[in-house]
Regions:
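Conformationally flexible catalytic loops at phosphate/diphosphate-handling active centers
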Residues: 1-15
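Short internal beta-strands
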Residues: 45-52, 111-114, 271-276
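Glycine-rich, acidic loop regions that bind phosphate or pyrophosphate groups
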Residues: 53-156
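Thiamine diphosphate
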Residues: 75-94, 202-281
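Conserved thiamine diphosphate
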Residues: 82-83, 137, 289-330
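Glycine/aspartate-rich loop-and-adjacent alpha/beta segment that forms the canonical ThDP
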Residues: 97, 324-369
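A short alpha/beta connector and helix-capping loop motif
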Residues: 126-138, 259-277, 356-358
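Active-site diphosphate/adenylate-binding microenvironment
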Residues: 158-238, 355
Length: 369
């Protein structure tokens, strides 16, 4: 990038009335969390992010609209649709975000910032591209942008947020969002959260409220099931045994690499594994329910694994929970353990990740129930 492009980007930001920052894992890789936050605070722009950037901004920050894309927030997707300027930082406009490239941010000019020049304008046409480290470019832009608040734009977005999907609590059944809320309440903002791949991964990205910068580890892009336990072990070893590491997984993903429990037990690593056990391959099954008239194929493996006995066989501590009260008690006890523990959370096989925008669709096609 050069100084003229930096000044042009700043000018486009200064002249826009409805700007939004859309950022991805490149911001995390570039250690660009604080430069991004500085830009948002000075300009008053809202921001939304991809799965790979979850945790870069904390959940309660006023500029944070939440996750974007197929399973993203209604308000975030609507804001992209209505924006007059999109600043895309460290992201590639994947098919989980730009579900319909021809309709993506159709009212907006687009600035794309990426370290890889081959990504610039590859999936979506852009008006200005800057090649380089996201952290340095954001810092370079900052002196040239005006301090503003975009009050009218933010008021409009707050109105859309009233229509964001709101899950319903239950006292008798274990709901995914309640599991994650309880994890947040007990493990807190200093914990490192790791996921496998599947529905639980999306629920984690949607509902983990306390993640700190670089405190959310997940496998996006390739979406490799079985990633979680090995990643959790790596995080625990890197941070030390006194750190809190929580691994969220599904029964499908966990079956693919649960042999890693041998390593966790051998080294007495106090990793808490929370298994979202719906006894199906839930993400694919959700697609079959929604788009293929409930023609289920290869998503119900009819497993009868007893995770509590399996944990004990490995030398870990095992729990089972079917209600919010049972999960609260199990997680509290797991927090006291000196070695690895697993909590088998029994959830319904028809639980869905919502909202959902179908592939090729737009925010106008969003499914809320």
């Amino acid at each position: 990038y050069n100084e003229e492009d930096v000044k042009k980007a700043a000018q486009m930001i200064n002249e826009s009335e409805r700007p939004i920052v859309y950022f991805g894992g490149g911001v995390r890789s570039a250690a660009g969390c604080q430069p991004l936050r500085d830009l948002l605070e000075k300009t008053g722009m809202p921001a939304t992010y991809t799965l790979m950037a979850a945790g870069v901004l904390s959940y309660g920050e006023p500029h944070n609209l939440g996750l974007l894309g197929m399973h993203g927030c209604y308000a975030a997707n609507k804001a992209i649709d209505e924006a007059d300027l999109v600043i895309a930082v460290g992201t590639r406009f994947s098919d989980r975000v730009a579900l319909n490239p021809d309709s993506f941010a159709k009212r907006a000019k687009i600035i794309q910032i990426d370290i890889d020049p081959s990504e610039l304008g590859k999936n979506v046409d852009v008006d200005l591209s800057l090649t380089g480290d996201a952290s340095y470019i954001l810092q370079a832009i900052l002196p040239y942008v005006k301090k503003t608040e975009h009050k009218l734009w933010m008021e409009q977005i707050r109105g859309w947020q009233k229509n964001d999907y709101k899950p319903v609590d239950s006292d008798t059944e274990l709901k995914p969002h309640q599991i994650i809320d309880e994890i947040c309440n007990q493990a807190g903002p200093e914990a490192v959260y790791v996921t496998d791949v599947g529905q639980h991964q999306m629920w984690a990205a949607q509902y983990l409220h306390h993640t700190k910068s670089r405190g959310f580890l997940t496998s996006g892009g390739l979406g490799t099931m079985g990633f979680g336990y090995g990643a959790a072990i790596g995080a625990q070893m890197a941070l030390g045994r006194d750190a809190r590491v929580v691994m969220l997984t599904g029964d499908g993903s966990f079956h693919m690499n649960l042999n890693e429990a041998c390593t966790a037990v051998s080294y007495d690593l106090p990793i808490i594994t929370v298994i979202f056990n719906n006894q199906v391959l839930g993400m694919v099954r959700q697609w079959q329910t929604t788009f293929y008239e409930k023609r289920y194929s290869d998503t119900d493996p009819h497993r009868k694994t007893d995770f509590v006995k399996l944990a004990e066989g490995f030398g870990a501590k095992g729990y089972r929970a079917a209600t919010p009260a049972e999960f609260k008690a199990a997680f509290a006890d797991a927090m006291k353990q000196k070695g690895p523990s697993w909590i088998d959370c029994r959830i319904g096989k028809d639980e869905k990740v919502l909202p959902m925008i179908p592939g090729g669709g737009t925010v106008n096609d969003i499914i809320m129930e």
